[in-house]
C-alpha cells in the first residue's frame, strides 16, 4: 500500500477471498511440503457454487482515510496482486498477477502506461534516481503461493504463473528507455 500526501489518498491492493474454515478437531491434517493454511481448498471450490459466497476479487483501490470513501477502483483478473508505489508526480504503480506492470493516474485511476513482463508481481515497486534520472523498479515473480493455487481461486488461466511459469527477476524502467524485455 502507498500514500499520496498531495491527494490524501491511500492506494490499497485488495485481496477479497472467502474461505471456509471448519473448527472440527481432526478435520484438517497438516501435510508437509504443501500449502498448510488450516483450510481445504477443495472445500472452497465447492463453496464457490453455494449461494451467498462472495466472488473472489482483487483490485487496486484509492481510499480516502479521512472520509472512508473509495475514490476509484480498478478490478484485476485475479486476487493476488502486488503492492503499490505512489510518486510525487501523481502516478501510482502496481504489478499484477496477469503479468502487467501498470502506471495509474493517482487522482482518477486512468491507466497511463502498462508493460507485459511475463510473470506475476507481488512485491511493491520502488523508485530511485541516478545522475538526475528517475527509475522505477520491481522485483517480479510470484514469491507467494496465491497464484500457484489455480482453480481453487478461479481465473487460473489468466494469471502469469500459469501462462509463463514463475521466473523471478528484477526489472527497472525509465522514461524513454529503449531496451527490450527478453522472452522467458
Task: Show where each model-derived region lies.
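Long, low-complexity segments enriched in small/aliphatic residues
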Residues: 2-19
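Extracytoplasmic/lumenal domain signature
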Residues: 21-79, 85-88, 92-122, 126-184
Amino acid at each position: 500500500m502507498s500514500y499520496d500526501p498531495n491527494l490524501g489518498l491511500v492506494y490499497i491492493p485488495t485481496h477479497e477471498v472467502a474461505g471456509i474454515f471448519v473448527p472440527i478437531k481432526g478435520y484438517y491434517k497438516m501435510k508437509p511440503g504443501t500449502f498448510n493454511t488450516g483450510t481445504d481448498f477443495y472445500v472452497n471450490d465447492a463453496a464457490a457454487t453455494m449461494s451467498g459466497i462472495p466472488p473472489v476479487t482483487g483490485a487496486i483501490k484509492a481510499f480516502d482515510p479521512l472520509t472512508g470513501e473509495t475514490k476509484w477502483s480498478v478490478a484485476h483478473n485475479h486476487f493476488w496482486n502486488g503492492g503499490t508505489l505512489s510518486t510525487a508526480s501523481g502516478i501510482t504503480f502496481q504489478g499484477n498477477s496477469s503479468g502487467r506492470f501498470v502506471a495509474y493516474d493517482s487522482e482518477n485511476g486512468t491507466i497511463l502506461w502498462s508493460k507485459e513482463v511475463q510473470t506475476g508481481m507481488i512485491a511493491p515497486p520502488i523508485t530511485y534516481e541516478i545522475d538526475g534520472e528517475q527509475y522505477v523498479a520491481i522485483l517480479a515473480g510470484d514469491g507467494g503461493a496465491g497464484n500457484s493455487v489455480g482453480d481453487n481461486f478461479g481465473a487460473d488461466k489468466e494469471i502469469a504463473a500459469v501462462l509463463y511459469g514463475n521466473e523471478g527477476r528484477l526489472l527497472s524502467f525509465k522514461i524513454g528507455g529503449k531496451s527490450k524485455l527478453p522472452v522467458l
